[in-house]
């Protein structure tokens, strides 16, 4: 599969029913049967795990509560401020100056602002953000965004600031998919497709959260593992030393070698193929992977898939599937998830 997400046929998602469950997997006894096909969603932080969970909820009619909308709305404001602050810092470090000199002062005030901003922006702050984002030099810097860490949804939310920064703003389905909301604790959703009930567990992917993973291992029928291949040049936020791709591959290796998952199928989602392909022209893969022999985008994608498969070790080929995807692309994920769920049900027969 190449880098383009177009050309996918419209998918007919089956009629479904859904509900939420807050019961941790660890509360089930080992001899108790489960009424759902149980799925565990794993991956490092910012790999796209939660986006996959949100796609499942939206595609399979798992409606959000008002409190969940409120929670996500708060993080959307937080995302916007973090993005503009990251851009201002990148501008300060770059060889580009603002086209409008007044924006230099605005940028400095954004950088100096230590508030987390989980709510609607003041009129003054919103105007600063809009002016900085509209600056021609800032747009030139944004075109070079692959050279620094920036949330993939930055342009989406900054371009929609007028709509978002209102008292009656309620996130749309697209907003929910584009927002980055870190997973806290164990989240799970129960949904029904084609008369089969599934339960999908999502656990935080930061190092401090991974100790909780083992509490969810019992009775799992399949694993979804998200790996953001675009992170080949980035460092982990926890230590700013460890390469994110190396960490994710090591994590995948650990999961594959876990004795409790010896016969559990792993569905590997190689996420952010669009960002990956965009980066290649600016940040050569060979700068970070000396074992990459070179080639075009398809060669680079094949190389990344081979790295992931190698991390699975001696796992039998029948016990894993690899998919290249863009987790924020709802149509692509609808087709992918439909294929995956059918494969899981086939294994259970």
Curated annotation (Swiss-Prot):
Task: Give the matching InterPro entries.
Answer: Gprotein_alpha_su, GproteinA_insert, P-loop_NTPase
User: What keywords are annotated for this sequence in UniProt?
Assistant: GTP-binding, Lipoprotein, Magnesium, Metal-binding, Myristate, Nucleotide-binding, Palmitate, Transducer
List the residue ranges of the region (G3 motif): 198-207
Ranges where the record places region G5 motif = 325-330
- Give the span(s) annotated as G1 motif: 38-51
The keyword Secreted is assigned to this record: no
Q: Which residues are covalently lipidated (S-palmitoyl cysteine)?
A: 3
**Cysteine pairs bridged by disulfides in the record:** none
The protein's GO terms of the molecular function aspect are: G protein-coupled receptor binding; G-protein beta/gamma-subunit complex binding; GTP binding; GTPase activity; metal ion binding
Q: Which GO terms describe its cellular component?
A: cytoplasm; heterotrimeric G-protein complex
Q: Which domain of life is it from?
A: Eukaryota
Annotated GTP binding lies at: 43-50, 177-183, 202-206, 271-274, 327
For the lipid attachment N-myristoyl glycine, which residues are annotated? 2
Pfam families, sorted? G-alpha
Ranges of residues in domain G-alpha: 35-349
Any idea which positions bind Mg(2+)?
A: 183
Region of interest (G2 motif), residue spans: 175-183
GO biological process, alphabetically ordered: adenylate cyclase-modulating G protein-coupled receptor signaling pathway
Query: Per the record, which residues fall in region G4 motif?
Result: 267-274
Q: How does it assemble?
A: G proteins are composed of 3 units; alpha, beta and gamma. The alpha chain contains the guanine nucleotide binding site.
- Its job: Guanine nucleotide-binding proteins (G proteins) are involved as modulators or transducers in various transmembrane signaling systems.
The protein's name: Guanine nucleotide-binding protein alpha-13 subunit
Supply the source organism for this entry: Caenorhabditis briggsae
Primary gene name: gpa-13
